[in-house]
């Protein structure tokens, strides 16, 4: 998982994994005879780690805090953690590799349908239905896109402004704010 996040998919070879983990190549090949077997195990491991981090964010929600703000801040932090970086690297690599795309599909669907929805639902305590799903999707996909962006100037300022807009938009969709709150003049 760490190698995927740090050096990327192309450089995460069986030989590199063996070297970094201190295993002989033979020992690694005994447990993972093919790159595909290693990938399947890595995807399952990464998925489990992402789920645990999301649950910890739910469990760590401060009492009395704005749940929408907490959910967005928590997910933003998680997107910079190794399991999320590794999964993003696999998703990027899957664009050009059909077999990897097929291997990732189940994990992506599980995360989209269950884990991310349930955990963010617990975080924001939103309602059900298309409006609230749109709120969660807006926040999730904006944050994921922003996490992958390479802002070339004023990165912190631009990021902070975008995070504030995402929070206000999510509140509006959750009927906790007005359209005029999206970009207040001040």
PLM segments and residue spans:
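Amphipathic alpha-helical packing segments from all-alpha helical-bundle domains
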Residues: 50-56, 78-88, 98-126, 134, ...
